[in-house]
Amino acid sequence: MILFSKMHGLGNDYVVIDESAQECIPEDKKPEFVREVCTRGFSVGADGVIFVQPASGEGDIRFRIFNADGSEAEMCGNGIRCFSKFVYDNAIVRKRRLEVETLAGIKTVELEVEDGAVVSSRVDMGTATFKTDQIPMDVEEYEFIDRFLPVEGEDIKLTALSVGNPHAIIFVDDAEGVDLDRLGPAIENHPLFPERINVHFVEVVSPSEIIMVTWERGAGPTMACGTGATASVIAGVKLEKLDDSVLVHLPGGELKIDVYQDGTELGAYMEGDAVMVFDGILLRDP
């Protein structure tokens, strides 16, 4: 039997498994386990699986996240908010300022607590890079900002960047009118992105407000994407389309993104909530 919790951040839903005291799923079995558990209709169903693990020494606790297809992601904005609430509410680490180890480096999470439970969190998402070799992107250009990419017989103007994981940002007039099921996977799996990429279509309502729809790498269409919201606002600031404080409307709810300057680079804070849905037991061997 495997104990788990089901959580979501703006409808981006996850199975959370506590491995802070002992390993529940062997490393070599994690991808297969994730694919099985995330399959809707046949198991719990989720956009991904989060594992809570002990820190290696640099942080308070370690965050690992796997996409529904079994691939491991570097970072996830909605996922880290769920993770932080789980860690605090279950007294695994009882700090209101968490230093969380991720594959994208240490992320600082500040928790707002009421009646002993986390109600909101603010995450320092760190700085973005537009360097194509760090996204990565298989092109000769140093950066790919507001450039055309041939996709499905049309030229799509996009900006590529990484905020610890890769994102393609496409500014459009009507985000909700985009043919996401056609363009999303075509861009995600484009040969210029050797590690695939998260895809976001962004409509600018005003310099302080956007609407965003997402096709996530390894998960498909999702209700929200925290790193994607962060990347979209940073790209908008870079292109002088947006102010440095932006409300992001997603199918699952809203996030607030505040961009800051760190030397020559742009970073951002992401603020939003996370919800505990239920606890459960998987009646299977790991």
Curated annotation (Swiss-Prot):
Keywords, ordered alphabetically: Amino-acid biosynthesis, Cytoplasm, Isomerase, Lysine biosynthesis
EC number of this enzyme: 5.1.1.7
GO terms for biological process, alphabetical: lysine biosynthetic process via diaminopimelate
Residue positions binding substrate: N12, N67, G77, N78, N165, N198, E216, R217, G226, T227
Site (Could be important to modulate the pK values of the two catalytic cysteine residues): H167, E216
Keyword Isomerase (UniProt): yes
Family annotation (InterPro entries): DAP_epimerase_AS, DAP_epimerase_DapF
Reactions performed catalytically: (2S,6S)-2,6-diaminopimelate = meso-2,6-diaminopimelate
Stretches that traverse the bilayer: none
Gene Ontology CC terms: cytosol
Location(s) in or outside the cell: Cytoplasm
Catalytic machinery residues: C76, C225
Enzyme class: isomerase
Recorded metabolic or biological pathway in which this protein acts: Amino-acid biosynthesis; L-lysine biosynthesis via DAP pathway; DL-2,6-diaminopimelate from LL-2,6-diaminopimelate: step 1/1
Domain of life: Archaea
Annotated GO MF terms: diaminopimelate epimerase activity
PANTHER family named in the record: DIAMINOPIMELATE EPIMERASE, DIAMINOPIMELATE EPIMERASE, CHLOROPLASTIC
Function: Catalyzes the stereoinversion of LL-2,6-diaminopimelate (L,L-DAP) to meso-diaminopimelate (meso-DAP), a precursor of L-lysine.
Similarity field: Belongs to the diaminopimelate epimerase family.
Subunit structure of this chain's protein: Homodimer.
Protein name: Diaminopimelate epimerase
Gene (name only): dapF
